């Protein structure tokens, strides 16, 4: 029941925010920022303390390892060791593939690109821009619910301050992966590479040992600024040509 409640809550959040953006013409940044503050405030009302997950199914999924049939090697004891993945990673990759197919090969996916690129052109093409926006926000809310479930499986708990600042990490990863902030350009594969680049930087700084963890934020911020400036330059060149 808890999983269903989380998914439904995500859909409701997406529906409300999508309605405010698409039909009330409120700025998306304001709507989503207010929604984030509202959701975080509601979690604080529910509990300000850490809530541990003791459900046996969740705990089993958190400990489960899916071994890959390739890439094995002999350890020092002469035992063959194979690489493995956690179920949450596999589920995330499945959703990644589905999102790629949806955006690239379906009418709804192409409509999202059209609306993101130029709303007026999309209207002239006969697209129902408001409906496309609403559907996109509902889908986003559902995926946020899925992501929160996977995150809780990994951490086996929930806390009001959990995932604080992840919204900026998501924006940075998307921009580094080639998504234009002006809309209409980007794909989930590029975003995946953006996430991997960010994770590589974090791992390097962590294992380097002599650098403060704040250097991660500084490096990501510098990369974000660089790619935004690069996008602006490319847009100016394209417009000039």
Language-model regions, residue ranges each:
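Transmembrane alpha-helical segments in multi-pass inner-membrane proteins
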Residues: 14, 138, 143-144, 154-221
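Transmembrane helix-bundle core of multi-pass membrane transporters
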Residues: 4, 24, 28-106, 132-134, ...
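Hydrophobic core segments of alpha-helical transmembrane domains in multi-pass membrane transport
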Residues: 7-10, 36, 40-42, 89-102, ...
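Cytosolic-side transmembrane-helix boundaries in multi-pass membrane proteins
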Residues: 124-131, 201-241
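Transmembrane alpha-helices
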Residues: 30, 128-152, 168
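Hydrophobic alpha-helical transmembrane segments
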Residues: 1-8, 30, 89-94, 134-138, ...
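Alpha-helical transmembrane segments within multi-pass membrane transporters and channels
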Residues: 1-37, 193-194
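Membrane-helix/interface signature in polytopic inner-membrane proteins
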Residues: 98-137
